[in-house]
A protein has these predicted regions:
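N-terminal, Lys/Arg- and Ser/Thr-rich interaction peptides
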Residues: 2-29
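Alpha-helix boundary/N-cap detector
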Residues: 13-16, 28, 32-35, 39, ...
Length: 218
């Protein structure tokens, strides 16, 4: 799993400032004592499980491009291998939806020097990309497979009454965590996460920004 503080290799694919931060906390109002996170997480898990069950055959078609700075664009054409994994400890309803962006064409890059080769290779591995290396006396070559492992994790911060949504390699390479007040984890937000995964629709970012602005005014 890549470090949350690793800078993404890709350029920002959205024009939203929220997509350029590694962690964003949306301030919360006082949560009602009777409100619990379990129903919210349960609905999110059911929605993600339904996606995983329906997306297997045939695979979902989606053209995506991951811009690798200094290398080129890694292109994929489908979403495959969806799965839902529950967090084992603590068993608080947290879970992860994992999947893969899959394509057909490898991305080949000849490095200008051994130093560049080593730095690029490390950063590619940090993002869990599948990389083959070919070295000779005169050149070092990176062959990047058209496969990007991605995940969306839903978890809990009970000490602050927050739900956390972590996107890893979704739309762009890198990991970003959104900490949201419990009441923000509603049907619209959950559906927007699914739309972000399956269509790259950016409603999720807009809802997150709207939630932050609403609480600043409140």
């Amino acid at each position: 799993m890549p470090d949350d503080n690793t800078e993404p290799l890709t350029i920002d694919l959205t024009d939203n400032p929220i997509s350029r931060v590694q962690s964003r906390v949306i301030p919360s109002r006082v949560v009602r004592p009777t409100e619990t996170i379990e129903p919210h997480l349960a609905h999110a898990r059911r929605t993600c499980a339904a996606l995983a069950a329906s997306a297997g055959n045939p695979p979902l078609k989606l053209k995506a491009e991951f811009d690798l700075v200094g290398i080129g664009r890694l292109r994929t054409t489908s979403l495959e291998n969806f799965a839902v994994q529950d967090q084992q400890e603590p068993k608080d309803g947290s879970f992860t939806l994992s999947f893969e962006y899959c394509g057909r064409e490898q991305l080949i890059h000849v490095c200008a020097s051994e130093a560049v080769y080593g730095a690029l290779r490390k950063r590619l591995f940090d993002h869990e990309l599948t990389v083959k290396s070919v070295s000779s006396a005169t050149a070092s070559k990176l062959i990047i497979e058209p496969l990007v492992s991605a995940a969306v994790s839903f978890s809990v911060d009970r000490t602050r009454d927050l739900a956390r949504i972590t996107l890893r390699n979704v739309v762009m390479l890198g990991t970003t965590t959104y900490a949201l007040p419990l009441e923000c984890l509603d049907r619209n937000l959950i559906d927007s996460v699914v739309e972000l995964v399956t269509t790259q629709e950016r409603t999720f970012y807009a809802l997150s920004i709207a939630a932050a602005q609403h609480r600043k005014l409140g």
